[in-house]
Amino acid sequence: MSELLCQGFNQKPLTTETCRPEAAYTPPVIEAEDLVILSMPVYAGRVPALAVERLRKVEANGARCVIVAVYGNRAYEDALVEMQDVATDMGFQVIAAIAANAEHSICRMYGTGRPDEADAKEMASFAEAILRKMQGGTPFVPLTLPGNRPYKQGCTGPFPVADDQCTDCGT
């Protein structure tokens, strides 16, 4: 979903993997004039603790940030407010938030084929609205997002075990 959003900005994104424990992680360098698309998967209404831990190593430098919670057609619950809190605590200006519905990572029958053409159009529309907001010159005000504080308790597992047909898609 974040790739579709970035297409709307006509920019090639610099991506950093924060969710896979086996992936090496080097915090990206963020400048104050950058626009950061912070996209995370949602599992049981929360974002991955490893992603948050790694993200906290980034120096935000006051950069603008769009948060994208990608969920598998069930619910995103507290993910947006959790992402907002983490990003704000790090020094980002959270200027927009998107809850993006995608194919479920385990039960593929939910959200099958997503993102699709309609999702691509919607993300392009979001990109246009975000650009207008950035060019408008008005100060950014904190967003009021759905979710609970304190967040619901996180959970672990069950985790699927891949067989030799795994393509390392990351889901």
Model-derived features: where do they sit?
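Cysteine-centered iron-sulfur cluster-binding motifs in ferredoxin-type domains/subunits
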Residues: 1, 159-171
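FMN-binding flavodoxin-like domain, especially the glycine-rich phosphate-binding loop
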Residues: 1-158
